[in-house]
Amino acid sequence: MSANLVIVESPAKAKTIQKFLGKSYKVVASNGHVRDLPKSTMGIDVDNDFEPKYITIRGKGDILAQLRKEVKKADKVYLATDPDREGEAISWHLYHALKLENKKCSRITFNEITKDAVKKSIKNSRDIDMNLVDAQQARRVLDRIVGYKISPILWSKIKRGLSAGRVQSVALRIICDREQEIDEFISQEYWSLSADILVPGAKKPLEAHFTGDKNGKVELHSQKEVEELVNKLKNEKFEVLSVKNGERRKKPPLPFTTSTLQQEASKRLNMSTQKTMRLAQELYEGVNLKGKGSIGLITYLRTDSTRISEEADANCREYIGQQYGEEFVGDKKSVKTTKTGKIQDAHEAIRPTDSSLSPAMIKEQLPRDLFRLYQLIWTRFVASRMAEAVYETTSVKIEAGEYHFNVAASRVKFDGFMTVYSYDTEKSTMNAAMKKITKDTEITLSELKAQQHFTQPPAHFTEASLVKTLEELGIGRPSTYAPTITTLLARRYIVKENKNLYITELGEAVNDMMEDGFPTIVDVNFTANMESLLDSVEEGKVKWKTVVENFYPDMIQAVEKAEKELEEVKIADEVSEEVCEECGRNMVVKYGPHGKFLACPGFPDCRNTKPYYEKIGVSCPKCGKDIVLKKTKKGRKYYGCINNPECDFMSWQKPSAVRCKECGGYMVEKGKKLVCADKECGYVTDKEEEK
């Protein structure tokens, strides 16, 4: 009989830990949470100090029964769930569900699933940290109140199956605000000018960029300005004003936090946040390797910290010295650090548990995506302990009368950390002409080249950039980024096309209603402050029920007001002019998961359906037929000709009936402005003036 029972969340984690502890321990899994708030009711006794009413999760009864049998056999129980709020709460629920009050029971935590870390945690066992549990309870209760009270309003005012969330709704607003910025952005024309400079003895010319005159930067806004400048410059003598040679050092990147791992995995590996976290969980809990059995390959994956333990730091530096040479070992004093007030800084950064276990050594034993993620984590960590990269730089200033041009070039002198982390490698721009040129070099103008540009709107959010923005604004924590994005996609509030996230018509409707009825809930500062309060609960500075108590009255007041004042945005069956070709009835407008469509009112006898096209009252500039609002397969709105495919007109911006006064072309709406669709024209006017 095993004298010691260790309870973890997952079978994979149990298998890995069992190997380390031997026969005197039995390691079993709870398969995640065993108790939660009920699904059928709010499960919070508002009149009794917001006491949660936890119940056994459906399907977990058999697991608990088996765990109780194991508890009876054991002399001591160790609760070894994950080292964060959620893990602490699972341990607390297990403690009560298994009635461990009269049993020798301890809480153990480890940042990595290795033999040394697990055995050390048993020596340093402790009681359950109720501050951590209370922080999780506060988050769970707040999220339940928001979801349970607001979601039914969305059901009644828009459609069933929708949801609101404390973090989810703010993230949706952030995406909506960005889409509005993009829609209202008015592109401005500007020009750049460069000069090809001939240097004696060099086959290829230098490309020097116009920077301005002696008084500073000069901006070029039109072709006319450029032509005037070019005519002046053709009559000027080009001379070298100065040549500066130097060095530039590039610091290695910090090791990964949850946020930066999700961002880099999205950019480098094209992985969603959800997939990144799933694979990282596998790497953390244990992977089977030949000769080693099941072993945890990385440290805990939910962290805000870039801190590294002294032991891991020393081991990695030793590995770098042996594999690459001592000159590649980074200076401890030059290692970048980050300061964070967030509570998760108690953890280390995400790193390999053994830096000597290189990706090449285990490539054949891991599935492709698991290997790619491990490789990314390993290279980032090893690079963070390596020396800076050193660049040789040359900067040349050129004078042409009163005007200035500049050339800057660099090449790698010492690779440093880029030997491992090739993502940060910069292409060498040093050519023969740059090496030959001095202040006394006689140079000659070969050609002046002008290029037209247009200012670009802010970029659409990607999963990576949204995670970065949420973190910068203090919205959510490492455990919430991926589930938040997953929920928004699942509810079809947003869609993803070529990595970009776009708001859908449904997402706009939900956000508009949240802004009208619950402005506090979708306020970025309010949500960030709430996260700070939850951190304060974890630190023992604030009672969790006080946080909920202060939040609840205003929330209920907003709900009551919204129920009375918010108008429905869903439309009853609207009869269209479209006639059903199968039965002759006028078709009606219906709402489905992807928005509006036309259906025959004779259903179920007649099941005919058609796409719904909303006319905007503007004629197609190509064929004269109606322009209609359409959607891509993923739900993104655009405007196209009803005569498609015979006519291929389309526009992402809403076309206007007003014609451009400059070129006669069609114009599109950009917020309060009308802008000519022809960028070469660029005519802009106010919408109000054209009414």
What do these predicted regions represent?
Residues M1-R140, K149, G212, L220-Q223, ...:
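Intrinsically disordered, low-complexity regulatory segments
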Residues S2, D82-P83, K159-S163, N245-L254, ...:
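Conserved short loop/turn motifs at secondary-structure junctions
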Residues S2-N4, T16, K23-Y25, S151, ...:
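Basic, low-complexity terminal or inter-domain segments flanking catalytic cores
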Residues I113, A117-A195, G246:
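C-terminal or mid-to-C-terminal helical accessory/interaction module adjacent to the motor/catalytic core
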Residues R139-K149, V167, I197-V199, R248-T260, ...:
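Core structural elements
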Residues G216-L254, T441:
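Metal- or metallocofactor-binding catalytic centers and their adjacent structured scaffolds
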Residues V240-V243, K251-A265, K292-L301, P457-T469:
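Short acidic, hydrophobic short linear motifs in intrinsically disordered regions
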